[in-house]
Amino acid sequence: MSEVKLAAEPRTEFGKGAARRIRRESKVPAVVYGHGAEPVHITLPGHELLLALRTPNVLLSLDIEGKAQLAIPKAVQRDAIKGFLEHVDLLLVRSGEKVNVEVYVHTEGDLAPGAYLLEHVLSTLTVEAEATHIPESVTVSIEGLEAGASILAKDIPLPSGTTLAIDEDAVVLQVLAAQAEEAAEEAAGTAEVGSEA
């Protein structure tokens, strides 16, 4: 897991006008929550934060008035049209502390020969991991799977120290027969019924 250091500045102005002024200065308004403390309002450097958030579940080392604190992103608000960062909520974490996070599910390998489709029922898994060792993603093999096969949450290998935080029998991936094959089978079935009459 990567750790990104960011210099944070305390924020005393609030509201839409203040947020716009902050963003015009290429900064992003943010709020840091956690550990029973009062929320801390800060601004973060926009470009560095944008680059950091490209890594899923990035661990941020924030320098807030000379005090280093670890945090993970909890909520990221983006402009719906232009995509720039509008606001970020961060959760304070400590080394050794367990947190629940969403990790992306990636696949490797090829399905069995034939026109099969892989459906991602869940694109992410909720897992519990140590705050400083959060996996960016998990990978599962789909090599040779045929129509009707499914992969459950418990079938996905997790890194050491990471556990599932969802029902282990939740379907994550399933293999479907291609629509063209199903349509051909239905047409053949209808033709047989019609010829019997």
Swiss-Prot record:
The entry's keywords: Ribonucleoprotein, Ribosomal protein, RNA-binding, rRNA-binding
Pfam name, any one: Ribosomal_TL5_C
GO cellular component: cytosolic large ribosomal subunit
Gene Ontology MF term list: 5S rRNA binding; structural constituent of ribosome
Gene Ontology biological-process entries: translation
Superkingdom as given in the UniProt entry: Bacteria
InterPro entries attached to this UniProt entry: Rbsml_bL25/Gln-tRNA_synth_N, Ribosomal_bL25/Gln-tRNA_synth, Ribosomal_bL25_b-dom, Ribosomal_bL25_C, Ribosomal_bL25_long, Ribosomal_L25_dom, Ribosomal_uL5_bac-type
Keyword Protein biosynthesis: no
Leader peptide range in chain numbering: none
Function: This is one of the proteins that binds to the 5S RNA in the ribosome where it forms part of the central protuberance.
The protein's assembly and partners: Part of the 50S ribosomal subunit; part of the 5S rRNA/L5/L18/L25 subcomplex. Contacts the 5S rRNA. Binds to the 5S rRNA independently of L5 and L18.
Family: Belongs to the bacterial ribosomal protein bL25 family. CTC subfamily.
Name of this chain's protein: Large ribosomal subunit protein bL25
Organism encoding this protein: Streptomyces avermitilis (strain ATCC 31267 / DSM 46492 / JCM 5070 / NBRC 14893 / NCIMB 12804 / NRRL 8165 / MA-4680)
